[in-house]
Amino acid sequence: MEHITAQDYIKRLQTAMERNSRGPREIEACCEYAGRLLDARLPVLFDAAHVQSVLRLKEIDWNQAYHVFPISQGVKTRTVTAPSLPLKTRQRWILTEILPRFEVSPRAHGFEPGRSIKTNAELHAGHEYALCLDIHDFFPSIRKESVIRVFLEAGYSRGASSALAEVCCFKKALPQGAPTSPRLSNIIFKELDERLEAMAKRRGITYSRYADDLTFSSHGGMGNILREVERLLRPQGFLLNEEKVHFYGPGVPKRITGLIVQNGSVRVPKEYKRRLKQEIYYCKKYGVLTHLENTGSKKFVHYREYLYGKAYYIHMIEPEVGNIYLEELDQIRWPGFFAGEC
């Protein structure tokens, strides 16, 4: 794609509009509008028709735009709304070209560069008390009008903002499986993050958020913070999941975003490491294929990647421990198709 400066873009725009016999006021207004977006390092999109043209939205079959399916999580299921490949491509364009220009709260640790479940949990290491909360139906609770406001605040027209929001939403809310949803949720939740942090700070409490997981910790008690959190969330359309309220007192291991926080350190749960160790043991003792046949595993095709993924996850949290598991996996005699030899 040809790279042109903002000044060149404005000149070309002005020339094109003059050729099409546009009036001076309209030309001036369009050039000023484009200039503001270019100064903000945003792509120029004038209205809904322009968004449709640039993103080639007519090529999308909107009747087949999403695939909705459940994913098992223990005894419960979570509904994923996955966009079709053509729609996902457009959403990724919005994610890379528009959404990085927005600021999010430093307390938001999910889906942000340099932040992770580890950095989220580390904030609370060494604290005696912790309260972990979960927002019910987080993405579906973020409505289309909130997404429109994101693009309006960026400087886009109402028409362009509505069209961009339409690409990012499903049934007038953020879908669980769209690549734009995590970043949009962090942008939209920024004000609430700041209010929650300020409320917690006044009480000497540390606050962080990873997607829909809210964590508060302190060296003292929590007081009535649960009620205060609900008071801040409810007017914005967010409700807490009452079944996922976890309070931890002194001397108790704290499970924060799936990790164990205890004695000032952050670790992967023992049961997670134990299961991986067990699978490695059986692969070495019986061979990979025999082990999979004995267990009736459905992970047959990507089993090697599955195990290495677990080891790299451990390595991200506990590098030295993760290295041990990676070395153990390297010692397994993988069949040719697992090792990429065919």
Which residues does each predicted region cover?
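Right-hand nucleic-acid polymerase module
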Residues: 1-71, 79-133, 138-154, 165-171, ...
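Catalytic palm active-site di-aspartate
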Residues: 132-136, 177, 181, 200-218
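A short, basic-hydrophobic beta/loop patch
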Residues: 162
